[in-house]
Structures are given as structure tokens and as C-alpha cells.
């Protein structure tokens, strides 16, 4: 599974309250959630997110266990999230809603805002097309990869009957 897009680079410890503030949790439509993604940190994020790969530092998605965080990013048009590390529950929620995620230690030093990047989720490789740099991350394998390939957990369960 390969994904290519423009990098939007953010910092460490971006929690789910920043990804989608609690006041929007009454909504379930990913497109509506996406209009408010990252609002406290970057109010312009929804305008920049379509076709982008979100690159972040350590502990991305920490905080409360809200599936809407991954849905908001997907609804905003984010193609994938690459981070130095993830909160475990966000990582699984992203896979369950069909949002590709890849852990790649050191990614923030090697990718700048606006760089063109290509992810190989199965191989755990990030290529910075702009600079030629290759970053080796942790490959996604097994059931999480199968769920992601199916487009999320619900699609996986429908197709496995």
C-alpha cells in the first residue's frame, strides 16, 4: 500500500482534544468533523489537509479514546499520518476507520512542511521525494494491515463473512 502526498508537519504530544475538540463530538459525519480538525492548533488545517500526509512527533493522538479524532483527519482529506510514535488507542482507531498510520522514528528531522512524501505502509518506508531522503519506519503487518486494506474494520468484517 503506497500513499503519496504533501507533508504537513506538526510537533510532539498532539492530543485528541487538539485533533478534534470535545464540543464537536456530537457529530458523526467525517466531513463535518474534518472542518474542525486541528482547530485549536491550526485553524487553517482543513484548508491545507486535502491530499496531505500529516507528519508529527512523539505521542501523536494521546489523551482520550475518541474515534472521532481519526475520523476528523480522514474527513479533512488527510491521506495518512506518519509520526515518531503514536498513542496506542489512536493508532488502532485510525486503522479501524481506514486511515493509514506509520510509525517512523526521526521523521520530523527529515521531512519539512510542504515536502512531497511517499509512504510504503507494508514496507515501513517513507521516501521524501523532495530531498531524496529515505526514512525506515515500522512496517504494518498482519491483521491491522488487512483491516486497513479493507478500508477499515467495518468493511473488513463485512467482507470476511
Swiss-Prot record:
TM stretches of this protein: none
Pathway: Amino-acid biosynthesis; L-leucine biosynthesis; L-leucine from 3-methyl-2-oxobutanoate: step 2/4
Top-level taxon of the source organism: Archaea
A Pfam short name: Aconitase_C
GO molecular function (one): 3-isopropylmalate dehydratase activity
Keywords assigned by UniProt, alphabetized: Amino-acid biosynthesis, Branched-chain amino acid biosynthesis, Leucine biosynthesis, Lyase
Catalytic activity: (2R,3S)-3-isopropylmalate = (2S)-2-isopropylmalate
PANTHER family: 3-ISOPROPYLMALATE DEHYDRATASE SMALL SUBUNIT 1 (PTHR43345:SF2), 3-ISOPROPYLMALATE DEHYDRATASE SMALL SUBUNIT 2-RELATED-RELATED (PTHR43345)
Entry's family note: Belongs to the LeuD family. LeuD type 2 subfamily.
Subunit structure: Heterodimer of LeuC and LeuD.
Name used for this protein in its record: 3-isopropylmalate dehydratase small subunit
This protein's encoding gene: leuD
